[in-house]
Structure formats: C-alpha cells, structure tokens
Amino acid sequence: MARWTKRYFGWALGLAAFAMLAACDVAPPPPDAQAARPAPVPQPGEGTRSLRSEQLSRYYGRLQADLLAQGLLRTDGGGPDTPYSAEVLTQNFEQIVFFDEYAQGAGLSAAGGRSAGKLRRWNGPVRMDVSFGNSVQLSRREEDLASVRNYIRRLARVTRHPISYANEGNFHILFMGEDDKGEMVKILRRKAPNISQRTIDVITTLPRSIHCLVVAFSSNDSPHNYTRAVAVIRAEHPDLIRLSCVHEELAQGLGLANDSPDARPSIFNDDDEFALLTSHDEKLLSMLYDPRLKSGMDAESARPVVRILAREKLGQSL
C-alpha cells in the first residue's frame, strides 16, 4: 500500500507558512540567525537504505504477489474445502508439538527424522514487548504494534493463559531490517542477557529464504518450561507476509514448534497456503495449554488426553 505521509505533510506545512507570512509582514531573519538553525532531525525510516535492504524489499514484494496470484496466503482460516477429523487433529498436534522444525543446537539445520521430544510451553505469564529498528518508519510501527496487540489478545483468549503486552517483557518481538543489525545485537544482549554468540550469529545472518524466526529459551533445571523468547521479523516484508510472520512466530514461540506437511488448514505447513492463524491452529493452541496436559509429557503419555481434547474441540462425543 502506497503511503504519502511525508509528501502531504510537506505540502501542508508550506500552506501554513504561507498563511502566516500573508497575515503579517515579517522581515526575514539575518543570515547569521538562519545559519544557526539546527538541521532537522531525520525521522525513523527516512534515511538512505542500503542496496541489500532495497533488494530484499523488492524480492519479498514480488514473492507476495506471486503467492497471491497462485491463490496462496489465504486469510479465510479454512472452510468447506479443508475438512479435518478429530483423529487428524490429534496427529497434527503430535507432529507440531512434539517434534522440532530445526535440530536443537544446530542452527538452522533441519531436524529431519528425529524422535519425538517432550511437550514444551510457558508455565508462567507471557509478556510480549516490541522493538523496532531505525529503518522502520513511524507509520509502519503504528500498524505493526496494532497488529501485534490485537493478536496478543487473540492468543490470550484461545489459550486461556496469561499473555499480555508489556513495555519490558519476556517474549521479545523485533521488527528489524538489514540495516539494523548492529542495533539488533545490542537489543538482543540487553533483553536476553544469557543469549549465546552462536544464537546471535544465526539471527543476524538469516538467508533470504528464512522470512522470520523465533527462538525460545528455557532453564537447565526446567528444560520444558519456556521462560523467554525472541521473534525476529524482517522490516523489508510487505504487509501480508509481515503479518503472517507475526502470526506464525508468536504461536510457535508459545510451543507449536514444528511444521507438518499434513497440517491443513494451518500456518504450520511450509506450503504457504494460509497466511494467518486458522481455526485449526486455534484448536492446537487451546489443546497445548489445557491443564490436563503438562510440560515435559512425552507423545505416548499425552496421546490419550490429546485424543479427548481433539474430540472436545470438534464437538464430538467421547
């Protein structure tokens, strides 16, 4: 969407200045007074962007247009063309909750055929905060912040878990561009003081194919209880891919850690059919935070409970 804020503001300011001068005959200030005026402070996002950032912005813009032209990035949440049963919901839950998208401790290496792990989620309150790189325009920040806050309310409602927005939280959402990497490192070290250099290197050197990323942290004495997370969303993204990243990474940071090619309708599927959290995905989140499941459960012990939850979510008799 084209935005003309700066051009319109400059035109309006010119009219206001003209009206003031027409109302009273004011002599121009002496040359030395004019020279003493400080240069205007550039607003966020108004500086010159690097060639790399410009190239990424054009690439992701073309990518979004191509996906939409193929009927992908759906925002309808699914419908009659995407039915699923309680058994399918159970299987999708197991694949997405108990397996990892990436091998633990191996950067962005795919997890592959690893065995199932344990159920991980937040046991304590989740307080989400947002940081912007200097390359993000003020108008864009307002839109991103509104989207995040609306989505936080939805996540809290679906999970019935204490999830809220905070100025300083434990789940950090960073909208950062290529030109903000130095700033991003400082923010990461301040907000996640125990973050390793290896993790920082992974976050700051994402390949173009990785649109966004979330990293969740737990303590050694409670490895299945998340206590901090960092989500990074590229500032170069166009509107819908940007919002899609918000939906997927925040939900994954709550414990839906994997993608599955069989999950449909779902954003936890690399086929890009759906852009935003679906009703199917809401059920997964609601099941994940049901008190009948506990952090640290393995897939086998959780399966009987998950089957009951899946039937409940679809309104079926037990």
Indicate residue ranges for each PLM-predicted region.
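N-terminal low-structure segments adjacent to metalloprotease catalytic domains
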Residues: A2-G14, F18-F171, M176, D180-R189, ...
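Metalloprotease/metallohydrolase-associated module, dominated by Zn2+-dependent proteases
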Residues: V26-P31, A36-P80, K191-I241, A257-L318
